[in-house]
């Protein structure tokens, strides 16, 4: 399969990888949800620990074993790596908690609110300008979230909904930290550092509330970890081969996959109001992404003209 992909043009490669990312993200979440109500720390250690092994192999293969900075960072990138790890730990903890109580597609679409938090955090921490249209689209996105969680419903669960939104905020912080890192760290270093450090930090919490796992639960968690390896490297590969503006729209396909898997595996399907909310969030997110790329292109053209 890799040989066939290599024969394609870069844009097509990027599109294929972003679709693989969306599919395996949905599969990972399905497996984690199927594992049942076990402590979040335990789920995270399994998933991230397995991915850390893959990251270690990738770093060692690319740079050899002697250069420790390729594994644990250096003065130039340790701050960005640490911020990314903190946001990642908080984000995955919140997202896994939400995943246990919300239907799969709802948890996925609320995670996609992260694109709005990227703009907010970039304005606060990176001093990037925020324009009126961006503010409007952010408000529309959060309105869509309100429609999805439907606080007037009898079945409204405030804690999982807030956890999903908080997880999206942390995912946004994760993305901003990656922008702060820029080219200061290789993708394999970022993957290894986050997954290894987060697994180490969460291990004591796992041991304090350790739950003996059944065989099928263990298998689900191991498979989730293996699928998450594909998620991490597919995303990196997608943006390596194609500009973000050409493939970012397709990153929201995970919601479609999640809805399908949720129906097939759990027999759940979102209500009409929730689907309307999904459409509002995804439409606002796509417009925001396209608008951001338009701003970058205009800024770049102005610099070249000057």
In which residue ranges do the predicted regions lie?
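Hydrophobic alpha-helical transmembrane segments of multi-pass membrane transport proteins
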Residues: 23-27, 31, 82-97, 147, ...
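Membrane-interface interhelical linkers
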Residues: 1-23, 52-83, 132, 156, ...
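Glycine-/small-residue-enriched transmembrane alpha-helix faces in small-molecule transporters
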Residues: 1-42, 154-180, 300-306
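Small-residue-rich packing faces within the transmembrane alpha-helices of Major Facilitator Superfamily
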Residues: 49-53, 142, 199-200, 256, ...
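Juxtamembrane helix-entry segments on the extracytoplasmic side of multipass membrane proteins
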Residues: 10-14, 37, 45, 73-77, ...
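C-terminal transmembrane-helix exit sites in multi-pass transporters
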Residues: 95-97, 114-136, 256-275
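Hydrophobic transmembrane alpha-helices of multi-pass small-molecule transport proteins
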Residues: 133-150, 273-292
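Helix-helix packing/entry segments at the starts of transmembrane helices
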Residues: 107-113, 181-197, 232-263
């Amino acid at each position: 399969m890799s040989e066939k992909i290599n024969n394609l043009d870069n844009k097509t490669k990027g599109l294929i990888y972003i679709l693989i990312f969306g599919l395996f993200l949905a599969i990972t979440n399905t497996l984690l949800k199927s594992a049942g109500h076990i402590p979040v720390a335990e789920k995270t250690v399994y998933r991230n620990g397995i991915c850390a092994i893959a990251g270690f192999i990738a770093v060692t293969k690319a740079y050899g074993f002697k250069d420790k900075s390729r594994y644990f960072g250096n003065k130039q990138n340790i701050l960005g790596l640490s911020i990314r790890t903190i946001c990642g730990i908080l984000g995955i903890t919140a997202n896994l908690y939400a995943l246990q109580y919300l239907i799969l597609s709802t948890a996925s679409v609320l995670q996609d609110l992260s694109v709005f938090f990227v703009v907010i955090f970039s304005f606060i921490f990176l001093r990037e300008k925020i324009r009126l249209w961006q503010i409007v689209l952010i408000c529309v996105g959060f309105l869509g979230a309100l429609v999805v969680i439907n606080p007037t419903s009898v079945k409204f669960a405030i804690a999982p909904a807030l956890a999903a939104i908080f997880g999206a905020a942390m995912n946004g912080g994760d993305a901003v930290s990656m922008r702060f890192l820029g080219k200061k760290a290789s993708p394999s270093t970022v993957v290894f550092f986050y997954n290894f450090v987060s697994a180490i930090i969460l291990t004591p919490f796992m041991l304090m509330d350790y739950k003996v796992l059944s065989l099928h639960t263990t298998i689900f968690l191991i498979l989730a970890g293996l699928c998450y390896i594909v998620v991490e490297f597919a995303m990196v590969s997608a943006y390596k081969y194609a500009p973000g503006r050409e493939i970012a729209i397709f990153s929201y396909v995970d919601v479609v996959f999640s809805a399908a898997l949720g129906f097939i595996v759990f027999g759940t399907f979102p209500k009409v109001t929730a689907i309307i909310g999904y459409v509002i969030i995804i439409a606002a997110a796509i417009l925001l992404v396209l608008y951001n790329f338009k701003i970058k292109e205009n800024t770049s053209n102005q610099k070249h003209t000057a």
